[in-house]
Amino acid sequence: MATDMSQGELIHPKALPLIVGAQLIHADKLGEKAEDTTMPIRRAVNSTRETPPKSKLAEGEEEKPEPDGSSEESISTVEEQENETPPATSSEAEQPKGEPESGEKEENNNKSAEEPKKDEKDQSKEKEKKVKKTIPAWATLSASQLARAQRQTPMASSPRPKMDAILTEAIKACFQKTGASVVAIRKYIIHKYPSLGLERRGYLLKQALKRELNRGVIRQVKGKGASGSFVVVQKSKPPQKSKNRKKGSALDPEPQVKLEDVLPLAFTRLCEPKEASYSLIRKYVSQYYPKLRVDIRPQLLKNALQRAVERGQLEQITGKGASGTFQLKKSGEKPLLGGSLMEYAILSAIAAMNEPKTCSTTALKKYVLENHPGANSNYQMHLLKKTLQKCEKNGWLEQISGKGFSGTFQLSFPYYPSPGVLFPKKESGGSDDEDEDDDDDESSEDSEDEEPPPKRSLQKKTPAKSQGKTASMKQRGSKPARKVPAAQRGKVRPLPKKAPPKAKTPARKARPSPSVIKKPSGSSSRKPIASARKEAKLPGKGKSAMKKSFKTKK
């Protein structure tokens, strides 16, 4: 037992229950058939792994029923050695089981580490695919800014036309008297569109030829199938008329404006607060209002800005004097600044040059429904949502806050509209005022031009007045002759009696007299009234001539 204890101390602690079981078995063998009483104890103490050595020991007992003391010790040592081996085997069995588990864990860890990497790569690829930014047509960029933007934003390559359009283009280019041959068409497409790879993919040309033949766009002059010569069919007149009718019917209603073109102007008008620096205001005013001559006389602009700040129409956020940043003040929706041309120029400059231009979706919805209602408001809102998504994909807009069709958006490129685009009503009103001023000026000029002609008419009328006076005097002279009272008829009668016989000869002599001819020369002798007056004058002048002749004779 001492040897057993000494050996037990050196044995692994897992082997202790096995040793205790072996000792109990040895005690049972020495007793007289005590197996019935000890069996439940053995079963309770021994584990399932100890069952195989029990069977071996039972066989050994049958072979050697009467062992000696030395043999007992040897048996105990052998049993101990045999019992020592199973835990080693069990530990060895446990190790290989644990190894694959650890390997599986490492593989799982590696897989889990690889999965996020793949997800990140997929996300980056998706972003690269989505973000194909282009520069919009409404962006106002200088040459240097445009070059910089083209470097930063990978421009999407212009897509080539479809195969059907390429085929018709090739047939027209290679057309001859007998049409365009398939060989010439193939060479043309390979030379002009190498990206198609028609050398390897000849079926593309065959399919396109078949499609166009079925549609009636082209006609086969020679050959059959995908060989021979082809000609583009000219469009007949009836379909053109139908197209024109369709176009006319389409033009009857007002053409709808695309919301893509409306958005930048909407952002410019709805962005609040509106502010701009002095340099940007000066640049805008000098560009769109050259009459003010701000480049030559910058003091006018500075004085106008300072005056607007003093009146409370503008608020100076940064800087002092005429330098810094200025912000528009409003009463409700109308700005306080306005009136003179300089103030209107400053107002339009601050509204246009305000950066960055941001706007909320609620304000956008209200603006679109008021200015571009369309046939159906719900459909218009759907279009607005789609346009916002499209502009965001193209890189024209950025969503600052919110998700989807809510939040705030911002223009990615600068947009500086002209005053006519920004305030069309005011511009038209200003142009009307200018037209009125021009009309007034023209009318005043015309009146000034018309003033001298009245003077000329007066100058021309003066002789007419003199003629009228002479005529009236003559008429007065003639009238009393006609209306002479009966008492004076006896005195006046002898003069006309003597005058007619003597007036014939002096009348002939008096006609060539220059005094008589020169006087009527200034007046208009064409009028019959003047001729009648001259006839009335002649007898009176004849009398005076007769008197002079009588005096000379005497």
From Swiss-Prot:
Start and end residues of each H15 domain: 159-234, 255-330, 337-413
Cross-link (Glycyl lysine isopeptide (Lys-Gly) (interchain with G-Cter in SUMO2)), chain numbering: K64, K97, K258
Start-end of Basic and acidic residues biased regions: 94-129
Comp. bias regions, Acidic residues: 60-71, 430-451
Residue ranges, compositional bias (Basic residues): 238-248, 490-511, 544-554
Oxidoreductase is among the record's keywords: no
GO CC terms of this entry: chromosome; nucleosome; nucleus
Broad class of the protein's primary localization: nucleus
Compartments, as annotated in UniProt: Nucleus; Chromosome
Motif (PxVxL motif): 255-259
Region feature Disordered, mapped onto this chain: 30-136, 142-161, 229-254, 420-554
MF terms (GO), sorted A to Z: DNA binding; nucleosome binding; structural constituent of chromatin
GO biological process: cellular response to hypoxia; heterochromatin organization; nucleosome assembly; regulation of cell population proliferation; regulation of DNA-templated transcription; regulation of nucleus size
Pfam families tied to this protein: Linker_histone
Record's comment describing the protein's domains: A central region that included the first H15 (linker histone H1/H5 globular) domain binds at the entry/exit site of the nucleosomal DNA.
Protein name: Heterochromatin protein 1-binding protein 3
Organism (species): Mus musculus
